[in-house]
Amino acid sequence: MDNSSRLFSPLRLGKCQLRHRVAMSPLTRFRADDLSVQMPFAKEYYAQRASVPGTFLVSEATSISRESVGFSNVPGIWNAEQVRAWKEIADDVHCKGSFLFLQLWATGRSATPERLQSGDFDFASSSAVPMEPGGAVPRELTEEDIHDLIARFAEAARRAIDAGMDGIELHAANGYLIDQFTQASCNQRTDRWGGSIENRARFAIEVTRSVVAAVGADRVGVKLSPWGKIQGMGTMQDLVPQFQYLVSELRDMGLAYLRLSNSRWIDGVPQEEEDNSIYVHTWGASRPVLLEGGYDPISAQKEADIRFNGYDAVIAFGRFFISNPDLPFRIKAGVDLQKYNRDTFYTPISEKGYIDYPFSTAFLEEHSSKASLKL
């Protein structure tokens, strides 16, 4: 690839000085143990993908509390053992000269009801609306519940910083709890948390304010998926004005970045991508915007160099970062990308398809050469 591409120009993102604009997306992999603690081999997984110095990585979605764990084998950040495991991961990423934000989530009605019931926890959401017709009906969260959740996000953010993270990303996308408040397809409340564009956005805004107060705006990013049609989302009438309002409110908080995601697949079926440019323009050019959604090296370069040339665009990769731990190097050097194996994306507590994708020969040769020069 042309070395003059903006993909390989430095960028300040919050407190992080990135050397390039090829980022790793948050990727749920189900490799944590049954107590939501990262397995020891997760250190190698993240360190591998941090091997190109100056890379920006965001962790898999991480539960803010025991009550918010919607699935088995996803990591958490509510106790000392989890913090300790994450700190070892963050330290290894920093040793590679790269940066790591922890993505925080609560699942709401997207959780597996049986998983919550096994811990005697509520299956709850913004409203008593099932994710699909005939599905489990969640309990509507009370005012007290909502304030408790806002506080728990802030507590989780503080623990993430204690774990050595460079910042946190709020998962406000893909039909999970924050998104369940933002979109009218789920949120049918008539109190201050629903019934209008401003009220539906209130939960996302208040959660963001709480984590900003806890750790600082330059340590906070937010992920949105305005066009996402998974888990019952993307069908509301005022979708564009809803997300334009939310983006404008987030913009005024001075956050480290905004992430905009497109859903490339729904139930194994490829989807046509909607245009996120309206939200990029609303966000503006003063702070970074991360874009993700099935990019390859060619389309990533076009986004950075042509379509969003006037913006601090960072292109985030998911699947290709799974199968190419040296992805930024491969893209810059024009090295072919390895194919990924979908069958091992979500294999619980398994090293297969997790830490066994090889580095390119070219990367290993350059790395070996630089190591020799230091001796």
Swiss-Prot record:
Needed cofactors: FMN
One Pfam family here: Oxidored_FMN
Biological or metabolic pathway of the protein: Alkaloid biosynthesis; ergot alkaloid biosynthesis
Record-linked SUPFAM superfamilies: FMN-linked oxidoreductases
Catalytic activity: (1S,4S)-4-[(4-hydroxyphenyl)methyl]-2,5-diazaspiro[bicyclo[3.2.1]octane-6,1'-cyclohexane]-2',5'-dien-4'-one + 2 NADPH + 2 H(+) = (1S,4S)-4-[(4-hydroxyphenyl)methyl]-2,5-diazaspiro[bicyclo[3.2.1]octane-6,1'-cyclohexan]-4'-one + 2 NADP(+)
InterPro entries per the UniProt record, alphabetical: Aldolase_TIM (IPR013785), OxRdtase_FMN_N (IPR001155), Oye-like (IPR045247)
Binding residue positions for FMN: 61, 103, 171, 223, 294, 319
EC number from the UniProt entry: 1.3.1.-
Keywords in alphabetical order: Flavoprotein, FMN, NADP, Oxidoreductase
A molecular function (GO) term: FMN binding
Location of the active site: 176 (proton donor)
Role description: Aldehyde reductase; part of the gene cluster that mediates the biosynthesis of the alkaloid (-)-FR901483, a potent immunosuppressant that shows efficacy in animal models and a probable inhibitor of purine nucleotide biosynthesis by targeting phosphoribosylpyrophosphate amidotransferase (PPAT). Within the pathway, FrzD reduces the dienone portion of the pathway intermediates to cyclohexanone. The biosynthesis of (-)-FR901483 starts with the condensation of two L-tyrosines to yield (S,S)-dityrosyl-piperazine.
Family of the protein in this entry: Belongs to the NADH:flavin oxidoreductase/NADH oxidase family.
Protein name: Aldehyde reductase FrzD
Gene name of this polypeptide: FrzD
